Amino acid sequence: MLVPGCANALTARIVEDLGFEAAYVTGAGVTNMYLGLPDLSFVSLTQLTEHVAAMRDCTELPLIVDADTGFGNAVNVGYTVRQLERAGASCIQIEDQVFPKKCGHFDGKEVVETEEFIAKIKAAVDARDHALIMARTDAAACTSFEDAVDRCRRTLEAGADVLFLEGPRTREEIAKIPEAANAPFLLNLVYGGNTPILTQQELAQMGFAMVLYANAALQAAISGMQRVLGHIKTTGSIDGMQSEVASFDERQRLVNKPFYDALEQKYAIG
C-alpha cells in the first residue's frame, strides 16, 4: 500500500480524492508547514491533536499519525495515544529517539535504551482502544542495523502491530528488513534522504506492506510555490503559469464548497 504524508487537512483531501487508501500525518510536515521550522520537536501534542482532528473532519481515510517520541515517558505515551485516538487517529507511531528528536534523515540522532522503548510501546498498546500501534526505530543510524532489527523484534513481542525501521542506506539493508520479523513493515522513502528510492513493486516483492512518501506532497508544494511566485515576482504577472495553478473551481471542489452551498439553501430563511 502506498501512503502519502499530509501536513494539513487540504492535503488529506487531495490524497483521498486521488484514491489512496490511507494518509500519514507527518510530524516533519506539520512542523515545516505550520510553524516554518525544521523537524526538531517543536510541535506540541495539542497542536498535533488539532491537526489530526481537522484531517479526520474532512476525510474518511485511515490516518496514521506520527507521534514522534510520544511526548514524554511511558506514562505520557499512554496519554498521547488516548488523545490522538479521540482526535481520529487510526494508527499511532511511536519512535525510540531521545527527546528532542530529529528528522530521521538528519545527522546527530540518538536513541533511548531498548528497555525504555519497549516500555513506551507497551504503554501505547495498553492505552489504545482501537488504534494500531506502529513502532519506529532510528537505531540503524545510531547504534547498528542489527540493533535496529532486534528492536523491531522486541517491539513486536511488546504488542506493536506495524514495524518501521527508519533510514536504511542500501538496497541490501532494505531487503533484510521484512525478513526480521513476521509482521507488516513500512518503509519511508524521502526524496533527497538517506534511503534509496525503490519502486512499490520492488518493495512489495521484498515483503513490505506499506511504502510511505512522508513529505513528497510537501516538497512538491514548495517547488510549485517557488516556481509560480518566482514567475510572478520576475514578470509581474501569472501569465504563462496557468498549467501550474489549480483552477478556482477545482480549489472549491476540493474543499467541498458544493456541500456547504447545499446546506445554505437547505437552511435558508424566508
Set out the residue ranges of the language-model regions.
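Extended, intrinsically disordered, low-complexity segments
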Residues: A217-G270
